[in-house]
A protein has these predicted regions:
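Class I SAM-dependent methyltransferase SAM/SAH-binding core
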Residues: 15-17, 21-71
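Short alpha-helix
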Residues: 136-151
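A short acidic, Gly/Pro-enriched loop at the edge of an enzyme's catalytic core
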Residues: 70-81
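Conserved Class I S-adenosyl-L-methionine
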Residues: 158-221
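A short SAM/SAH-binding and catalytic strip from SAM-dependent methyltransferases
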Residues: 81-94
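Short, glycine-/aromatic-enriched active-site segment of Class I SAM-dependent methyltransferases
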Residues: 115-134
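A short glycine-rich, Lys/Arg-flanked "PGG" loop and its adjoining helix->strand segment in the class I
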Residues: 95-109
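Conserved alpha-helix/loop element of class I SAM-dependent methyltransferases that forms part
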Residues: 1-10
Length: 221
């Protein structure tokens, strides 16, 4: 929030796109004087978010919206900030930043995280995996160029260290594998999903020096 230069002294209107269960949404509501529209296409995530918001005393600041990120019903120049953490890949980075720009007020801030290569060359095994899973993975300079082409001034960039992936994402996911399989009766489809996630985790543990989530902060011009 400091890097983005968000003004804590005035009310802000924020859209959190692909909010999930609201970890970032609730943090923003606590830290800023803000009204937040929390968007996700899974209603069960939004229900969990609402429970968390009430328990944290910020429910009145948050409105949930169950829809897809590529069919947002927002008005032009409606928001001061668009925030999207670990979700824009569902739409594609370039498509997302291009489509969402019109929802920002002049000078509004875009804050998004995106899987990003940390090195110019990668092992073939890793490159092949991400070419199939998400071909838009690229180095930060390429992502910054996309922002510039679509009417933004890049303000800051940083990447998340390995412990963020492991402690906050992969380890909690691993802890749920057995319960997930049990809940789905050890079905073939469930086992395929778990095997796929295990493969992704193994790749990250092996090649964490080559990629991470990059956080991009940009200003609409």
């Amino acid at each position: 929030m400091e890097l983005a230069g968000l003004d804590r002294s005035r009310p802000l209107k924020i859209a959190d796109i692909g909010c999930g269960t609201g970890v970032s949404t609730i943090l923003l509501a606590k830290e800023l004087e803000t009204k937040i529209t929390a968007v996700d296409f899974l209603p069960e995530f939004l229900e969990e978010l609402q429970i968390r918001a009430r328990s944290n005393g910020v429910a009145e600041q948050i409105t949930t919206l169950n829809c897809s990120m590529d069919t947002l019903p927002f008005s032009d120049e409606e928001y001061d900030v668009i925030w999207s953490e670990g979700a824009i890949y569902n739409m594609g980075f370039e498509a997302g930043v291009a489509a969402w720009r019109r929802f920002l007020k002049p000078g509004g801030k875009l804050i998004v995280s995106e899987i990003t290569w940390l090195r110019a060359t990668r092992p073939a095994e890793l490159q092949s995996y991400w070419d199939e899973e998400y071909p838009e993975v690229n180095v930060a300079s390429a992502k910054i160029g996309i922002l510039e082409r679509h009417g933004y001034i890049p303000k800051a960039y940083f990447f998340l260290p390995p412990h963020c992936w492991l402690e906050n994402y992969y380890r909690p996911m691993q802890d749920q594998f057995d319960a997930f399989l049990k809940r789905h009766g050890q079905s073939k489809q469930a086992k395929t999903i778990v095997d796929s996630e295990k493969h992704e985790i193994t790749l990250y543990e092996k090649y964490c020096d080559y990629y991470s989530y990059g956080v991009y902060i940009a200003k609409k011009v």
